[in-house]
Structure formats: structure tokens, C-alpha cells
């Protein structure tokens, strides 16, 4: 059923929830459960449920926000352009690392889903989680997945990387800025880039190229796994 609610409703709810998440994240000095995106998601769902609003009421404005996903993804080219000298110098190492990481990500998700006997539709929904939302959602729909599950998987994956990515890099003593950026972008897409930006220009650029390449590799590799699932 279509909603007559103003698009501003969904936009205001999203911005307010994200603002609260940002405030809590800063106040708790980066406690991972208060990652802004995760808090915004929980608060948004709670607000709609308690207020008796439908998803259609929210999505009038949500679609406007969603429109900016593609331009935001393209904007990753800006930090990459600034570090094009490093891309030229280490291009094959960079590409090999991203491709290997992408394939490993999809393979691990497939094996885990297979191991716990998930339904085929759910498995297909989980496979694109390594790609950014702008790529993962249409890809999931195209292979017979469930977009809502894919969206949750992508966001959950990104939240984990945003909250704990820097910590994991320290634990595994990753010090090279190129390696840091590639790891963040390959595992955490857009929010991985956000962490990279906080670290430096090189990390941001490498994370950006990782997001783009992971998207391409995911699109090429997933049909193989869909055949294994039986689809």
C-alpha cells in the first residue's frame, strides 16, 4: 500500500537516528555497539514500530537517501586519483590482494551458510555482503536473493569493520598504509573507506580502489556459487 507521508519524514528519522548514534559513539569513545550506523538502524526500527508507522511511510524519504548511494560510490575515485602514483607502482600487488580477499570472502560465506544448512534463498542473499550496498542489493535481487537480508548482511559487515577494523590492524601488526587501506576496503566497503580516511590519504585511496574492485569481482564470482547452491 502506498503512503501519503511526506518524504521529509523518512529523511528526518534517518538523520536524527544517525545523529544520536554519532553522539553516543563519541561519548563512549568508540564503543563498537554504538557505531552510528548500527544505532541508527536499531533506533529507526524501534521508532517505526512504537509509533505504528509502516515501512512505506519511512521509505518515501528513504528512497531519496538511497539515490545518493551510486554517486557516493563514484566519489571514491577522488582519493584514488590523489594517490595514482602508488597505484601505478604497486598495481599488480594491489589487484592480486583485492581479488584474493574478495574470493575468500564469498567462499567463506558460502561454506558457513552451507555448514549450518541455510535455505538457498538466504544463502544467495548473504553472498554479496562483501560488496557495497549499491552493488549488493541489485545483485541479490538478480540471483534470487532477499534484498532485506542482503542489506542487513552488508550493514552488519560494515559495522563490524568500522568498529573493530583499526583494532584488528593493530593486533595483527599491519603497519603499511597500503595494506591497511586494502584490508579495510576489501572487508568493510564504504565504512572501511571511512576508517581509512581517518587514518590518512593513502589508506583512504587504497580502501576506495578496494571497494570498486571488490564490487566487480563479486559480480563475476557469485554466479559460480549460485550454481553450486542450485540456482
From Swiss-Prot:
Membrane association type: Multi-pass membrane protein
Classification via InterPro entries: Antiholin-like_LrgB, CidB/LrgB
Cell location: Cell membrane
GO CC term (a single one): plasma membrane
Record keywords, A-Z: Cell membrane, Cytolysis, Membrane, Transmembrane, Transmembrane helix
Transmembrane region(s): 7-24, 34-56, 91-113, 149-171, 207-229
Pfam families: LrgB
GO biological process: cytolysis; killing of cells of another organism; programmed cell death
HAMAP family linked: LrgB
Stored PANTHER family: PLASTIDAL GLYCOLATE_GLYCERATE TRANSLOCATOR 1, CHLOROPLASTIC, PUTATIVE SEROTONIN TRANSPORTER
Family (UniProt): Belongs to the CidB/LrgB family. LrgB subfamily.
Its biological purpose: Inhibits the expression or activity of extracellular murein hydrolases by interacting, possibly with LrgA, with the holin-like protein CidA. The LrgAB and CidA proteins may affect the proton motive force of the membrane. May be involved in programmed cell death (PCD), possibly triggering PCD in response to antibiotics and environmental stresses.
Protein name: Antiholin-like protein LrgB
Source organism of this protein record: Bacillus subtilis (strain 168)
